[in-house]
Amino acid sequence: MPLEENPACRSRRSFLQLSAAAAAATVGFRIVTEPMLARADSRPFPKDAVVIDANENPLGPCGVACSAVTDMASQGGRYSMWMTDDLVKTFSDLQGLKPHYVLPFPGSSEPLHYSVLAFTSPAKSYVTADPGYEAGAHAAKISGARVVRVPLTKTYAHDVKAMLAAAPDAGVFYICSPNNPTGTLTSHSDIEYLLDHKPKGSILLVDEAYIHFADASSAVDLVKADKDVVVLRTFSKIYGMAGLRCGFGIARPELLEKVAEFSGWNAMPITAVAAATASLKDERLVPERKRINATIRQATCEWLSKNGYSFIPSQSNCFMVDAKRPAKEMIAAMAAQNVFIGRPWPVWPTYVRITVGTQPEMERFQEAFQRVMSGAATASLTPTPEASFLNLDGLVIPASRA
């Protein structure tokens, strides 16, 4: 069903958008990203550190992507916007989409934030899972929207019926599937149910950052059907391009135009575009990396189960484990072992998120985790000044790991 649109709605929306933009300028608007949430400082890690805290891919860009970056670096003095058109066409052809349904960005954080700014307001709430990825809530605060957090179901899926009941005034329903931080899925049928029963004028913002790791159906088919859906994709996860920055907002043109009102139409970094295009053309990349990630994740979870540790089964490149103590203490204790794990979520105060690293990295994680859990590293459980915690919009994140 098309979004309701009349001159009065346009006028009011324009006013709210201008208000949001003014508020953003006043408070120093920042796009919150996974590295910002995972880390509060930019100092180098200690030597030989195991870094499994920000859902990065330790494999990095694939070979053809690295070659593409090298080949393109000497042309960095040109905008070369035609390359972005080629990237969009390559992706659109693979997905069976029309090119004007795809808008490229440096990663998926920007379209996430801009979508929230475009479709929420003081009268239009932002609805998300708890625990869930926090960045959209930050954008909702900029727009003056009410942030509604709804607990996951017993199977750790988004509780779409509870989300509907919690916010009849919703502007955006944010669905991250697989979910960050749990790595669990929300079924396509549940997403369709939410779409069929949502308030008129609202959208579903479906974040598929981790979809390539999972056995799951994409919501791109709903975009093809011209539904009120914006799908987010990124090259930061399975493609290993977190530092290069490339992603897409995918929606029917009317919705993308509203998102673009906040972003403009800027040139993309050509090295990222070249690497992304080359990666899409490598047919073996996704299935091979999915297999590697699943094998290492399964082996790690089998070890946790064998040793009596509680965790949440995942279909992503991360999972959550119960530390049986305050999460921030566990994070500090693991950091003292030179193993850096993910941040806590207030709703589950004893759970920590673990990114799936390489097999040697996960073996070192197991050694450090067992030492801490057995009490062998008890002296590390009290956070030192270097492991103290900051608070960013109510989000607890580590201040230092040196």
Name each model-derived stretch.
Residues P2-A23:
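N-terminal secretory signal peptides and thylakoid transit peptides that target proteins
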Residues A118-I175, D196:
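PLP-dependent aminotransferase-like
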Residues A333-Q337, W345-A402:
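PLP-dependent enzyme catalytic core of the Aspartate aminotransferase-like
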Residues V160-P168, P181-L204, E208-I238, E254:
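Active-site pre-lysine segment of PLP-dependent enzymes
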Residues G76, D86-S125, S143:
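Phosphate-binding glycine-rich loop
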Residues S19-R78, D93, K161, P168-D169:
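N-terminal "arm"/small-domain region of PLP-dependent enzymes with the aminotransferase-like
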Residues L152-K154, A294, W303-Q337, P360, ...:
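Conserved PLP-binding catalytic core of the aspartate aminotransferase-like
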